[in-house]
Amino acid sequence: MTAKPQLPERTPRVKGEPTALDGLLVVDFTRVVAGPACTQTLADFGAEVIKIENPDGGDDTRHYEHAEIGGESAAFLSLNRNKRGIALDFNNPAALEVARELIAKADVVVENFSGGIMKKFGLDYASVAATNPKLIYCSISAYGRKGEFALRPGFDPITQAESGFMSLNGFPDGEPVRTGPPIVDMATGMSACNAILLALIARDRLGRGQQVEVALIDTAMSMIGFYGMAYLISGANPGRIGNSPNGSPTVGVFQASDGPLYMACANDRLYRRLVVDVLDRPDLVTDPEFAHRKNRTANKEKLRAIIAGIFASDSLEHWMAKMKKANIPVGYLRTVEEGFNAPEVRDRHRLSRIPHPTAGAVPNIETPLQMSLTPTVDPVAAPLLGEHTREVLRKTLGYDERRIAALAEAGAFGKPGNTA
């Protein structure tokens, strides 16, 4: 039984170090996963990200039930670090005017509402581009902003299912399985971030902004990768293969006498080292049934049974030590708990704790991106709902206290009088 990780305080960055996106203003209308994942990366590297939420409950992920701390959900905390949060009721004309003023000042707008919502409120690209011609306007959706399916709602598992992505996940004798983590959402967020950065580079060269669009269905199809390319070339419909690509007898999960491991020996060189140096079975090299990759594939069930029987004869640590000595690609098959406590993770210093206004401190999982000259900003926990409304209106838009109070009284931030 492993222990809950002991999270250290996050080591501050060196004072005076530059950030990659310093001075970039991002107005963030996104919620749930793909959009917030995109804007969090921008915020991590120094962009000023202003997250706009509905005052009536805010981002859906605030109410996800995986876990909570200090009244905040794990999902929301994991996707909204380093942002400033404001609450605006779009049904209030005064709130819409605030949103338009923020867009007019922004370098980047990111939104992932259902089709037609931003247009309904006059906040779509066509409505705002004239007032800010250098604006990068990124729309994230399930099926795109144009075409027959533009108004159709959809989420990560729907696009996993409809793209064919889910059909490849699972075992041949079982049903298609969605991934546990929302992989299409996360990859769409990464793609949107890439697209925004490309558009910013183009703006520096061309002097004007543009509309950027990323759709979950497109991301899911691109992630099918060489399986999709193989289908287009051969016409053969790929199916589920479990843990071994093409049923390879030397790739996948194997059971030692006391636990599982995952091994990947996909070529002749690695196979020779495996059977000679690890399994002490040189006959599995000279036997013509197994001498080359094609032969091993043709006789995969027989070979896999032989290898599985050998692995079952000794302990996990015995085999891990031998395979690491032979430089065989192998890993422990861990739970999340085991993975987050593993030495490989501790060595990367990816986990820490950071201050939070209601919880005292919350866990922090660092971005996977590391840069030597422009590292990430010191992380700030995800905002409370509307936490920075007054601050943003005052510092970013130059509103005085009287104007802010009038907006609050008019219900621009939700119920009259509501403001941070």
Label every PLM stretch briefly.
Residues 1-205, 384, 390-420:
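N-terminal helix-loop segment corresponding to the beta1-alpha1 unit
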Residues 67, 76, 241-246, 251-252, ...:
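Short Gly/Pro-enriched turn/cap motifs at secondary-structure boundaries
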